[in-house]
A protein has these predicted regions:
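A short beta-strand-loop structural module common to alpha/beta enzyme folds
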Residues: 56-66
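Helix-loop-strand module that forms the ligand-binding subsite of alpha/beta enzymes
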Residues: 65-151
Length: 196
């Protein structure tokens, strides 16, 4: 009898989810970025900090070239950051999106469908193409049937990093944190069906 009870407990433990009845499943936010100067990486870290501020959020922070298929498909949300190169996303970020099909096989099932997506950028000048860059990132997400959100700004978060505004200032960092927080909140609503 004791053996039968022990076996039942083991089976129940293996079959139950990794959270208790009063806990919600964690939301996983993947923050993927490309950075040469360190400015976009700083924004990525701020985005991650904002997402972590939402209770029950797990954050994975990686350069776009390090992201694996399991990273992508196990996430509930994806926030992509790029420096502005010629008023567009960096080639490494474009390759990341191209690899969704070439390496990870997202089609024809639309494996990113209904995941939450957002964008952030850094650019040297005030009108260097930051909004356009965010829109190209968001367009790639929309093409994959993701749910895109903003936060911190109309299209995401951005920083001007040259001239009279070198690096990422506190206002820009706060905008990045707000983006991360909003994405984590929306991902929680999508995953759980309600606001916590």
């Amino acid at each position: 009898m004791r053996v039968a009870v022990a076996v039942c407990f083991v089976l129940l433990a293996c079959a139950s989810p990794s959270y208790t009845a009063d806990q919600e499943p964690a939301v996983t936010v993947l923050v993927a970025y490309h950075s040469l100067s360190g400015n976009t990486e700083k924004m990525a870290r701020e985005v991650a900090t904002g997402a972590k501020a939402v209770l029950g959020t797990r954050v994975v922070l990686k350069r776009v070239g390090e992201v694996t298929g399991p990273d992508l498909f196990s996430s509930d949300a994806l926030i992509v950051g790029s420096p502005v190169y010629w008023s567009n996303m960096a080639g490494e970020v474009k390759t990341f999106f191209d690899n969704w099909q070439l390496k990870f096989g997202v089609f024809p099932e639309f494996k990113m469908r209904n995941k939450v997506g957002a964008a952030f950028t850094t650019g040297g000048q005030v009108s260097s193409g930051k909004e356009l860059t965010m829109l190209t990132i968001l367009a790639a997400m929309l093409g994959n049937q993701m749910i895109v959100v903003s936060g911190g700004g109309a299209f995401g978060a951005s920083a001007t990093t040259e001239g009279d505004s070198p690096g990422v200032d506190e206002k820009e960092a706060a905008s990045a944190r707000e983006l991360g927080k909003r994405v984590a909140e929306v991902a929680g609503v999508v995953k759980r069906g309600s606001v916590k």
